[in-house]
């Protein structure tokens, strides 16, 4: 049971890090999708 407290301290940090990485990945996906959309619009006007 000695590892219980340390686990409860470490886990939230891992969860926070995971959420941060997911958020960064989502933002990158959104940016790339916006870029693709912008490129399509540019190609259509040419």
UniProtKB/Swiss-Prot annotation:
Coiled coil, from the record: none
Keywords, ordered alphabetically: Amidation, Hormone, Secreted
Positions where Isoleucine amide occurs in the chain: 46
Entries under SMART domains matching the protein: CRF
Any one annotated GO CC term: extracellular region
Subcellular localization(s) per the UniProt record: Secreted
Molecular function in Gene Ontology: hormone activity
InterPro entries in the record: Corticotropin-releasing_fac_CS, CRF
Top-level taxon of origin: Eukaryota
Cited function: Regulation of fluid secretion. Stimulates primary urine secretion by Malpighian tubules and causes a dose-dependent stimulation of cAMP levels in the tubules.
Stated family: Belongs to the sauvagine/corticotropin-releasing factor/urotensin I family.
Protein name in the entry: Diuretic hormone
Protein source organism: Periplaneta americana (American cockroach)
